[in-house]
């Protein structure tokens, strides 16, 4: 009987500690904010701000479906996908004779590293 009480007490203490640790993490952003417009300090002028999309979006990994894996040149059993913070709408502006695209709205979408 005493042994059962000891195990029960130890289990309750362990669960309490784990719950406390788990509640610390949702309050942290881990250095990456959500995808939103931020002012670009390099190109912005007083009265003429230039905005760009900055922030983080999700990424995930999952097992590659067998049908897809059979068609790959180099089969991989894990498939990953990611989205990037990109401009939904832009407006062209000229700052110091430099043509810029001022972002007006952002969202998480497919990553295009090769596009400007």
Curated annotation (Swiss-Prot):
Instruction: Sum up the protein's function in the record's words.
Output: Shared alpha chain of heterodimeric glycoprotein hormones. These hormones bind specific receptors on target cells that in turn activate downstream signaling pathways. Involved in gametogenesis and steroidogenesis.
> What PROSITE patterns does the record tag this protein with?
GLYCO_HORMONE_ALPHA_1, GLYCO_HORMONE_ALPHA_2, GLYCO_HORMONE_ALPHA_3
The entry's localization annotation reads:
Secreted
| Cited PANTHER family | GLYCOPROTEIN HORMONE ALPHA CHAIN, GLYCOPROTEIN HORMONES ALPHA CHAIN
Q: Which GO terms describe its biological process?
A: G protein-coupled receptor signaling pathway; positive regulation of steroid biosynthetic process; regulation of signaling receptor activity; thyroid hormone generation
Disulphide-bridged cysteine pairs: 32-56, 35-85, 53-106, 57-108, 84-111
Of the GO CC terms on this record, one is:
follicle-stimulating hormone complex
Q: Which domain of life is it from?
A: Eukaryota
Q: How would you summarize the oligomeric state and partners of this protein?
A: Heterodimer. Glycoprotein hormones are heterodimers composed of a common alpha chain described here and a unique beta chain which confers their biological specificity to the different hormones.
Q: What is its main location?
A: secreted
Q: Which residues form the signal peptide?
A: 1-24
Q: What is this protein called?
A: Glycoprotein hormones alpha chain
Which UniProt keyword terms apply here? Disulfide bond, Glycoprotein, Hormone, Secreted, Signal
The entry sums up its family as follows: Belongs to the glycoprotein hormones subunit alpha family.
Which GO molecular function terms does the record list?
Answer: follicle-stimulating hormone activity; protein heterodimerization activity
The record, for SUPFAM superfamilies, names:
Cystine-knot cytokines
């Amino acid at each position: 009987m005493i042994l059962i009480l000891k195990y029960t007490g130890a289990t309750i203490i362990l669960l309490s500690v784990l719950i406390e640790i788990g509640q610390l993490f949702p309050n942290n952003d881990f250095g990456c904010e959500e995808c939103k417009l931020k002012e670009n300090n390099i190109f912005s002028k007083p009265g003429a701000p230039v905005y760009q999309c900055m922030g983080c979006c999700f990424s995930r990994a999952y097992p590659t479906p067998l049908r897809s894996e059979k068609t790959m040149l180099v089969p991989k059993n894990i498939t990953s996908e990611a989205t990037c913070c990109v401009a939904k709408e832009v407006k062209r502006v000229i700052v110091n004779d430099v043509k810029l695209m001022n972002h007006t709205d952002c969202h998480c979408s497919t990553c295009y590293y090769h596009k400007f």
